[in-house]
């Protein structure tokens, strides 16, 4: 599942993103954030973090640096 999600995001980066002007107000970009989130947290939690990030990407949010949170260690 992780591989499929990352392939989908990479497809977006390669084929769709170049057709639109740069508009992401965050660093890293939302698509790069999605890849990092899925790699770090897996498909379910990484997908959820990516969805939350995309929903924040609008003109009324200031944006800025928003890294993927670290994976919490189980004790």
From Swiss-Prot:
GO terms for cellular component: plasma membrane. It comes from the Bacteria. Keywords: Cell membrane, Membrane. The keyword ATP-binding does not apply. InterPro entries: Membr_insert_effic_factor_YidD. The keyword Membrane applies. It is found in: Cell membrane. It is a peripheral membrane protein. Belongs to the UPF0161 family. Could be involved in insertion of integral membrane proteins into the membrane. This is Putative membrane protein insertion efficiency factor. It comes from Bacillus velezensis (strain DSM 23117 / BGSC 10A6 / LMG 26770 / FZB42).
């Amino acid at each position: 599942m992780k591989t499929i999600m990352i392939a989908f995001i990479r497809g977006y980066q390669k084929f769709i993103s170049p057709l639109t002007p740069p508009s992401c107000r965050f660093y890293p970009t939302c698509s790069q954030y999605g890849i990092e989130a899925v790699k770090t947290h897996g498909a379910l939690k990484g997908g959820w973090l990516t969805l939350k990030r995309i929903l924040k990407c609008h003109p009324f949010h200031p944006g800025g640096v928003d890294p993927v949170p670290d994976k919490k260690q189980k004790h």
